[in-house]
Amino acid sequence: MKELYTDLAVVGGGPAGVCAALEAARLGLEVVLIQNRPVLGGSSSSEIRVWTRGAVGAGNLFSEEMGVLGALKKRNLYTNPDGTPLFWDDVLLDAVTSQPGLTLLLNTDVTEVEVQDRRLLWVQGSQQASERTWRVHAKMFIDATGDGSVGARAGVPYWIGEHLFRKDAAPEPTALLGSSILYYVKKEDHPVAFVPPSYAYSLEDVEAPLGRGGRIVSETQSGSDCWWFEYGGLRNTIADAQDIAFELRRIVMGIWNYIKNSGRFNAACYTLEWVGSLPGKRESRRMDTAYLLSQEDVLRHTDFADGGFYGGWYMDFHPAEGIGSDEDNCTQIPVNVYAVPLRCLYHADFPNLLFAGRNIGTRREAFVSTRVMNTCGLSGQAAAALAWGCLRWGKSPAALAPEEVERIRQTLLREDMFLPGLSNQDPEDLARDAAVTASSRYQPEEGPAAGWFSLEQGGFVACPCPDEPRGRFLVRADAPATLQAVWHCCPLPSRLCPGQPAGKQSWQLTAGENWLDALFPSQAQGQYGMLVFDPAPGVSLALAERRAPGILCGRADAPEYRDPLFLPGKNSFYAPENVVDGCSRVWRQPHLWCSAPEAAPWLELRWDTPRTFDTILLYLDPELSMEIPSSRTDHWEDHHRFAARKGMPPQLMRDVSVQALTENGWRTVARCTGNWRRLLELSAGEAVTATALRLVREKTWGDERAHLFEVRVYRQHR
């Protein structure tokens, strides 16, 4: 037997476990990450190949998940722009194995735990192939297994469906979300025969459910298009996992046989390139934690004093009968971004065990939203920060004082977690009391249209309410017409949940181009205004040559957003001082500095007295309204409402330098080239004493301007 002693043991190597382990190690803890598979990534790995999705995929603008998960996704976009699942595995493995203070145990299945007075002492598992048994002793543990297996073995009560179970209780039959196996297809330049295995379902069995509830197959569907190949929701998704996997294999091979050999498809040259051997599991245990997130919390966006991360995926219900159901293959209720409290990550009676991933504490109606992998990754980062706080102050999570919880939240905010409504209050951040100036500031200008966006099917413009609550926009009409719209107000816009209605506005159009006034309602003050247009055949909205950050247009049914020629009234949207206003993302306002187009825009922080620092944190603009999935196929069905990125975000800073005004004059103290990160940490290499600091944007990935949400300056950051 091999034994390890550590600060934190994380069990489970999916997005939640990987993010938990990386965050904890970044915060200075010694960490052991235990994964029962040969690769990291869980359902997003090359073994299962479900793509990671979250708030943006469900229609929320400016809400792509960042933090630790965001850094991994950005690295994947940089090194693996085609979204190949194998390379996503390596992005995760590279991050984990290169992180100081982090030990990785692959192929190690934890089957035993030791508990004393409800405190975990160790977890133990066998490692495949090495014939080793590992026992890991830790001060804190995070169960990121998905199934909540560590918590269940430790005696933590848990939920399955609507039923609460305690240790050793036999689960009752219940209706759950099923599991799925995916496949990838490939088109060859010659016919490829397919002879089905004997276990595959017959053509007649496969044909029976097709066409019901949106279950339509084609020869081109591939990867996550196959999500509705679903089974197991009426079985025990843990105890019957192997039977479920084989049944899914029968279904998948039967469907492919139907595509190849029924004569209904142009599939002669198509073949299977890959078939999953492991199902992607959607639902099993949910732990009974100090607080259970509810449907009401999701729909009403409850403001929690201990909010630790956020969600934004649909309330996404699937019939338990899966592919055999007569119901729609899913019912998706869109929601706005909502907070999840840290109390969902622990049971008050178990002082050193935390949870992350789909096994956190929620009511089932909330679980169908929190279960997706982007949200799971954020929960892992939050659990790691909570573990760090517990070890720092020597307390259980339930015993933390309000000011200690707030310190954990501020730490998460610094580590690029978006906590809706929370602003930077870090007393160690020297940038907060600096005066800020810049070389320039961007102002949208009136000009000719760079293109046109049809309003035939309606559409929207999302813009934060300016200080002068009005704006101007250009439309073109083929003939005289009436254009009508409804105003909505919200802190963060969504194409599917535009917010509270706040009045109507209409315009009489003449044939040709018309400049129109948009009058923001009083309810929009301090919020976003969403101007939602009724369908207007023959009317188009003018598009701008350059994006005005924080202002977008689009349609409710489409994930592609455009840049309207919309001129807001007097505002401070892109002012230099926004970089120290405490917000590093869009929330009610853009909260960023955007320069005018120029060769080397700069931003300067200046203090009344000299300050000593060694670290500068820059929170950059990676285009937060576009998804960065872990992987994707060359083809995806329209119902996913997914828009693929074409390369790196043009507004992201690529090359940047930092200069300091010391007693000997200006000198460069830090520089980065080829940046791909959203949170860019620059080290001066030594303590620098200066009265001013200047950031110079040398190059972006395409934009002529500089985009910057926030600057932080620290002495001895870590």
Please annotate each region the language model reported:
Residues 17:
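N-terminal Rossmann-fold NAD(P) dinucleotide-binding loop
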Residues 153, 471-473, 516-551, 696:
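Short, well-structured beta-strand segments enriched in hydrophobic/aromatic residues
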Residues 498-522, 667-684:
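Extracellular carbohydrate recognition and processing domains
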